[in-house]
Amino acid sequence: MCIRDSLQSEQIRSRIDEFGGKLYLEFGGKIFDDYHASRVLPGFLPDSKMKMLIELKDEAEMIIAINANDIEKSKVRGDIGITYDLDVLRLIDIYSSFGLVVRSVVLTQYNSQPLAKAFSEKLNSLGIDVYRHYAIDNYPTDVKLVVSDDGYGKNDFIKTEKSLVVVTAPGPGSGKMAVSVSYTHLRAH
């Protein structure tokens, strides 16, 4: 563990306390094997994020977001050549192998898509809770609608137990930030 990882972990713990014992952290980019970031960011190692999370594993749980439309289109990760849904299963295995708790997957932009429903059933059979977040018309510009019962209010509330909730995804456009904001909105109401 490098000093930087320990400092980041301490800052996260401080933020957990600052925000009343619960922090939602949206992790963009790769959590491990981030060779691009290690090339362009001085001092950043390919596994810096993972090392920090391992240090926080007793306090953290992972939520993985995946866009239901990406499941339906069989969207493929260009770097490793597998579909986003298969990558969710891979990420669950990898995070779990490092002792990180993964008990939830959120299907974003959900509209009862057939392949998304099948994927939900597969996750349930593996003991993973599945939550649905629905498309919101005029998101994010119609703030009044977004924060109403017909916006974030219609999304499933994600049950969490740990003080640090890390929201991640197989790739961009999966809805990580929307899941984080929706979750904090639902928790407040």
PLM feature spans:
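Glycine-rich phosphate-binding P-loop
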Residues: 165-185
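N-terminal pre-Walker A segment at the start of P-loop NTPase domains
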Residues: 138-152
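Phosphate-binding P-loop
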Residues: 157-162
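Conserved small/polar residues in nucleotide/adenosyl-binding loops
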Residues: 1-5, 184-189
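Structural beta-strand/beta-sheet cores of well-ordered domains, especially the beta-sheet scaffolds
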Residues: 21-23, 163, 179
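A short, structured active-site edge motif that brings together acidic residues
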Residues: 134-136
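Short, well-ordered, mixed-charge alpha-helical segments that flank or form enzyme active sites
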Residues: 72-73, 112-115, 138-142, 174-175
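Long, basic/Gly/Ser/Thr-rich N-terminal segments
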Residues: 4-132
